[in-house]
From Swiss-Prot:
NCBIfam families: PRK13687.1
Organism: Rhizobium etli (strain ATCC 51251 / DSM 11541 / JCM 21823 / NBRC 15573 / CFN 42)
Cross-referenced InterPro entries: YjhX_toxin
Family per similarity comment: Belongs to the UPF0386 family.
Superkingdom classification of source: Bacteria
Name the record gives this protein: UPF0386 protein RHE_CH01859
Pfam families: YjhX_toxin (PF09857)
Segments passing through the bilayer: none
Amino acid sequence: MDISRTEQRILHLMAQGGRIEIIRDDNRKIENVSCFTRDGWLYPGVDLDLFRRLKRLKAIKSSGGQPYRITERGLRLVRSQLDNR
């Protein structure tokens, strides 16, 4: 399955240890989505639509109220890239 360039970029960031945190409103609806790198920096490329696409692909998952992390399926979807570090 092909994924878009932005999805690829976010999954690669999450495969390196990044996470997606969500903020809910009073009605328990998702209000804001933030992506953090493994170093704790805020990554600006994630919006609610991209978050929903990744969740629909089952590439990310949250367990026990923790931030969203990449799944095994997400690791298979992401193509390997050089680390650039």
